[in-house]
Amino acid sequence: MIEAYETDVFMDPIGMKVWEKRHQYVATKLSALNCKRVLDMGTNTCKLIQRLSRSLQFTQIDGLDIDGQLLETQGIQNAKPDLIQNQYASMRDHQLVVNLYQGSALNKIQHLKDQQYDAVILVELIEHLQVEDVFLIEQNLFGFLRPQFVIVTTPNSDFNVYFNFKEQGVLFRDKDHKFEWSQNQFQIWAQKVCQNYGYKVIELTGVGEHKTEGTKNGFCTQIVVFEKDTQQEKYLNFAFFNLQEGEIRQVCQILYPFESKEQHFQREVVDSIRYILHITDKQNQFEDGSYQNYTTLSRIMQNHSISSNWQIQGDYFKLKTYIQNISEFLVHENQFNFQESFVTLNYQAQMEDEENEDQLESDSENVKMQQQQYYFSNDNCFSTKDTTYSSFSTADNLFSQKIQLGQQQMALEEIELEDTIDY
């Protein structure tokens, strides 16, 4: 409803829309609070998860929504790694797991409580509930799940004067909204939550300023950030909570590509030595047509990134040990060899006879297998294909589908989701 007014109403020098501002605020705040495990209640099309996944701090991002079909289509599409995420793999040194669940935010679900989230986020969700259901989501969120932090965003009805709703006979910004709070109503609700559940407000703010009048009528979207107050918690009694037990269906689990510190280090070693060998002028030529580039340990030690970043200044034994440890990895069908004080890169001659061609093909397959072992950190997370999508079931029928996403080798290809996806 408000999209038609964005150009005329909102002030933003770089042209960000209000929903983008909300996501930007949430991502920035979660980063400042050092949250690693978060739940997005009412995740919808998973646009917020897409934004959060670009941060390297998170280890788990879960999304919950009542609309399973939406999660299976747009949700999965937005939550899976894109080209940016695959480029991030070399910077992400821990696994990021994204889980999408179909279920109600009004029911208590032990599986979600067991995740021990650092933060739970409600972005433009609460206004879609019936007024009587607000109390239920309060109980579930602040009484049952009890994360350390809670972020809630909702429309500010005071700001609606700029939308000319009366002339159009419109009451709320969206036809599915059951109510919209004024700034005063929102603050009163936040205060009651703190009193009833042992939380405190650490920030009350918003996003979306009017183009000419600024925050005269507040922000377009109002935001509150709660933090659990451990001093009050021991005096609270949650026995009166009568939430119904609920069930959830896990729509998918997505494992983001990452590179452990050891893998990252080994790759840097290989890349640095290959570069040094590539630019060296020293070369041996053999009768069979093969040739060999080589360099000395002292030449490698002179490389600034090796001596500084690897903390091995002058320690030739340590450098030799590193090189020996990585000598098993083959790169571009050529092998590193370590002999005495020299490091060499061997290039095989062109093979003409059929026997040698078969041997070369076999060697090439071995090379590919070893490269896969090097670049893919976990067989359960990665495969030689970009994506494998399969359906399965368990005894408790909790898990229905699973996505295993691997690191891309070239560029992403556009695909359509089917029962089985392989690309």
UniProtKB/Swiss-Prot annotation:
The entry's keywords: Magnesium, Metal-binding, Methyltransferase, Nucleus, RNA-binding, RNA-mediated gene silencing, S-adenosyl-L-methionine, Transferase
InterPro entries, per the entry: Hen1 (IPR026610), SAM-dependent_MTases_sf (IPR029063)
Main localization (coarse): nucleus
Cofactor(s) this protein requires: Mg(2+)
Annotated cofactor note: Binds 1 Mg(2+) ion per subunit.
Mutant phenotype after disruption: Defects in programmed DNA elimination, and inefficient production of sexual progeny due to reduction in the level and length of piRNAs.
Catalytic activity: small RNA 3'-end nucleotide + S-adenosyl-L-methionine = small RNA 3'-end 2'-O-methylnucleotide + S-adenosyl-L-homocysteine + H(+)
The enzyme's E.C. designation: 2.1.1.386
Residues that bind Mg(2+): E124, E127, H128, H177
Subcellular compartments: Nucleus
Binding site for S-adenosyl-L-methionine: D65, S104
Domain of life: Eukaryota
One BP term from GO: programmed DNA elimination
GO molecular function: metal ion binding; O-methyltransferase activity; RNA binding; RNA methyltransferase activity; small RNA 2'-O-methyltransferase activity
Gene Ontology terms: cellular component: cytoplasm; macronucleus
Enzyme class (EC, first level): transferase
Similarity section: Belongs to the methyltransferase superfamily. HEN1 family.
Subunit-structure text: Interacts with TWI1.
UniProt function note: Methyltransferase that adds a 2'-O-methyl group at the 3'-end of piRNAs, a class of 24 to 30 nucleotide RNAs that are generated by a Dicer-independent mechanism and are primarily derived from transposons and other repeated sequence elements. This probably protects the 3'-end of piRNAs from uridylation activity and subsequent degradation. Required for programmed DNA elimination.
Name recorded for this polypeptide: Small RNA 2'-O-methyltransferase
